[in-house]
């Protein structure tokens, strides 16, 4: 989690030292791990490398701040390094999970309310952390050996929903 978020720094006032640390931990570390694996040539053919990301890399989410930037860079690293790994028949993907209450997530202002909103906006409901883990296992199987350089949404349909009847009904009830 971003130190800027944890310390309550607004995006327009962020601390750049903290930004750099978050960038290194949340994105650059993925490149570093893949680089070591590349140099040691330690991935099997049709192996899979995976990172978790979040839809805020592609959409605006207030108070997620520089984590959005970090996740966008993480996804870019997966695509770019994935191109090179493809030469060795290794897949590289990111999975964008539903909002999930974690220690880090609990530090985001208004996250509890957002969880409820995301549940209402997801036709299948929010995916749990365990369901995400199950999905990730499939990305290590031969069933997905031609899937690479993708950001795959595992969010109950949240990423594709403009609005749901559940959300409309809540606003209708208020009026």
What are the language-model segments listed below?
Residues 40, 141-145, 163:
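Generic structural signal for alpha-helix termini and adjacent loop/cap motifs
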Residues 22, 29-37, 77-78, 135, ...:
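Hydrophobic positions on the long internal alpha-helix
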Residues 3-6, 10, 14-18, 22, ...:
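Catalytic loop of short-chain dehydrogenase/reductase
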Residues 92, 96-107, 154, 160:
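Short, flexible catalytic-loop segment of classical short-chain dehydrogenase/reductase
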Residues 148-175:
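Short C-terminal tail/terminal secondary-structure segment
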Residues 28, 94, 112-147, 152-156:
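C-terminal helical subdomain
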Residues 110-113, 170-171:
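Short, hinge-like loop/turn segments at secondary-structure boundaries
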């Amino acid at each position: 989690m971003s130190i800027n978020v944890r310390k309550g720094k607004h995006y327009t006032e962020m601390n750049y030292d903290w930004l750099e640390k978050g960038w290194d931990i949340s994105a650059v570390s993925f490149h570093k791990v893949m680089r070591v694996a590349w140099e040691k040539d330690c991935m099997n053919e049709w192996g899979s490398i995976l990172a978790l990301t979040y839809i805020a890399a592609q959409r605006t989410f207030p108070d997620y701040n520089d984590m959005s930037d970090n996740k966008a860079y993480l996804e870019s690293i997966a695509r770019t390094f994935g191109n090179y790994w493809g030469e060795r028949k290794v897949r590289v993907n990111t999975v964008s999970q539903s909002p999930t209450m974690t220690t880090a997530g609990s530090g985001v202002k208004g996250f509890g309310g957002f969880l409820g909103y995301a549940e209402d906006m997801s036709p299948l409901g929010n995916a749990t952390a365990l369901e995400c883990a199950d999905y990730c296992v499939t990305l290590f199987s031969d069933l997905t050996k031609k899937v690479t350089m993708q950001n795959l949404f595992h969010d109950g349909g949240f990423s594709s929903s403009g609005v749901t009847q559940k959300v409309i009904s809540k606003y209708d009830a208020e009026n």
